Amino acid sequence: LFFLILFYPHLFGYLSTIFSESMFYYALLFFAESAVLYIYYYGWHWLQGGIRKWIHLGLGLSLNVVGTCLMLLANSWLTFMMSPAGVDAAGVFGGDTWAAMNNFLWHPINIHRFVANIAYGGSIVGAYAAFKFLTAGSQEERAHYDWMGYNANFIAICALLPLPFAGYYLAAEMYLYSQQMGITLMGGIFAWLFIIQAVLIGTLFLSANYYLWCGMGRSDGAKRYTKYIKYIAIVLVGAFLVWFTPHTLVLTNEELKALGGPHHKILGPLGIMPAKNTAVNVMIIFTALSFMFYRRANKVATVSWVNAGNAIQVALFTAGILNIMFLGIYHGYFTNTVYKVAASIPQVLTTVVVIVGSITLDSFIYKNSKEVAPLHWGRIPGRAMYALFLLAVAFTWLMGLMGYIRSGIRQHWHVLDIMRDGSVDAFTPTLGFAANVVSVAAIIFMAMVIFVFWIAQVSSNKTLPSGYWKE
């Protein structure tokens, strides 16, 4: 907000005439969030036990609610710049702030950022747990921060699985609002940034799965499922390679002549959206399968129909994957564009049915199950902690990249088709320059996070008074 006021005072002045009321509430909510955070943090020990623990829980929930409201208000300002509403063609405000807030892209980006922030929050907590685990001085501390890291990774995975769907929904709404904006997003210069995005999201999936596989070492019964890990890894890597395969290659004139065109004859078809939709759905399903194996690792089913239940689950996964492949291949390559685009919806529904159905059935199969042995918290290799670090770094870089794309598709407009950016810097930078700026921003943010970790470490160290000051 400070840089917006400093570098774009005219834009801020225009936005403040429209959103002055919401900006007032934004300031109030900011102070409310700070107050709740202080009480939550400094009342940590005071609010333990009895009725006070419920007050502590309520403060934590209130902190999340206030933070979400802040995000929703800020989202209304940025989406107004992309899909202005409540103003006439000349940009004159009609007086209805709610109409400006409730613009075409407000709800799609609310959903996308809400899910993304849950995943991102889990990754940051996981990174903190990894840091504390690696610096722990006792087995008890290692066990505690191992447990903390697992729960943080669980939250991140739960939000990561629906995140691609929320992103596709947002992109579809952008197309619906403005085809020019949609074409710029996926078919123009920004298309190559989505290749980088695919690499980052693939990194997230591989890191999350790797952590789960390492975490199976906590259980004495994990050896029953470790033999399947290599097959899951092969599928994930294969889907990852399909996901970031570009449709059009960046080539020199000599390479273009040698290849016979900008498209690779074999790999080119993997660069279009039907292949990528298929790949991401397969990655999501196999990530859910990894989590199911982790949950099962320390359990022994006691129900009489366990074999039948397992057979149903295998059939569900097999049928779901075959259906996703059929929809992606047949409708993606052998039908017209209408069916090609529409096929993504039943693919998503298939993925949801497979995951929800299999986990629901699994809960019944392992109801009243026996434990193989108590979980050995802290019995996890240190390299798994670096997977948690990678999750946090990749999420930070990804959020910076997608924020740039979201702003960049407005091109030379501050507010699309209303307020033009007439400055000398109103141009789309090269991909390399944009990537460097995002990298610097990610490094600065991660440095701030590391500083917070260090402050927390310093505040936990207590030194007994000695000498003159000792009482």
Question: Where are these predicted regions, by residue range?
Answer:
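Polytopic transmembrane helical bundles with strong interfacial aromatic enrichment
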Residues: 1-471
